[in-house]
Amino acid sequence: MFLNEITIVITTFFSEEKLIKCLKSINGKCKVIVIENSKNNELKKNLNENHKNVECIVLNENSGFAKSNNIGLKMVKTKYALILNPDTILEKDALHNF
């Protein structure tokens, strides 16, 4: 599978430390959409500065896991989408085996 055909959607709520580890395991290999439920604009700033493959949407309220994932999925423009939790660490070739 070509990594440019996958967008990863991650819903978070004050999970920056875990999210950064997750993003490192993705290693900039495909597009990522982060939906942050905590009004944490600092997270968005950090991601914009340090992770060029990541788009962060900060919601005005905690919309919950399902609704937030649906918001992220509506933004996906690739053939495939993969929903991850922020504490997920991908194995080295996990995306190649998707």
Predicted ranges, named:
Residues 12-28:
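Short, well-formed alpha-helical segments that are part of the catalytic scaffolds
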Residues 4-10, 26, 31-35, 56:
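Hydrophobic targeting segments
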